[in-house]
Amino acid sequence: MKPNYSVNTAPKRSDEPIWWGLFGAGGTWFAMITPITVLVLGILVPLGVIDAEAMSYERVSEFATSIIGALFIIGTLALPMWHAMHRVHHGMHDLKFHTGVVGKIACYAFAGLISALAVVFIFMI
């Protein structure tokens, strides 16, 4: 018995898995890490729950120049930007702004620029 479907032996490769991976990583970071960062830096330290000395310039600078700190700062800046730009790109399509490849390149180039700037700024510290 012959199956009623055909298998494409030369499928077209897509770049979507790369963008979906960055989108998912950015969304996860933004949902799980960013609220804790805002809680600690924006609420607990100003209220005095966490000692202000823990956030002194020397300690924060030391953290930012360590590999873990640098990766944390880059992740905090870059990953949510990839998530947001992926949403903007697909949101434009949903709103019938069919920008095609130009819109895709503009969105992802902007996210790439922010990611590159995050890396550059880490090396400037």
Swiss-Prot record:
Gene Ontology CC entries for this record: fumarate reductase complex; plasma membrane
Cellular location(s): Cell inner membrane
GO annotation terms (biological process): fumarate metabolic process
Tree of life domain: Bacteria
Keyword Cell inner membrane on entry: yes
Record keywords: Cell inner membrane, Cell membrane, Membrane, Transmembrane, Transmembrane helix
Pfam families: Fumarate_red_D
Membrane topology: Multi-pass membrane protein
Cited Gene3D superfamilies: Fumarate reductase/succinate dehydrogenase, transmembrane subunit (1.20.1300.10)
Record-annotated disulphide pairs: none
Transmembrane helix is among the record's keywords: yes
Molecular-function GO terms, alphabetical: succinate dehydrogenase activity
NCBIfam families: PRK05470.1-1
Annotated family: Belongs to the FrdD family.
Function in brief: Anchors the catalytic components of the fumarate reductase complex to the cell membrane, binds quinones.
Xref: HAMAP family: Fumarate_red_D
Subunit structure: Part of an enzyme complex containing four subunits: a flavoprotein (FrdA), an iron-sulfur protein (FrdB), and two hydrophobic anchor proteins (FrdC and FrdD).
Protein name: Fumarate reductase subunit D
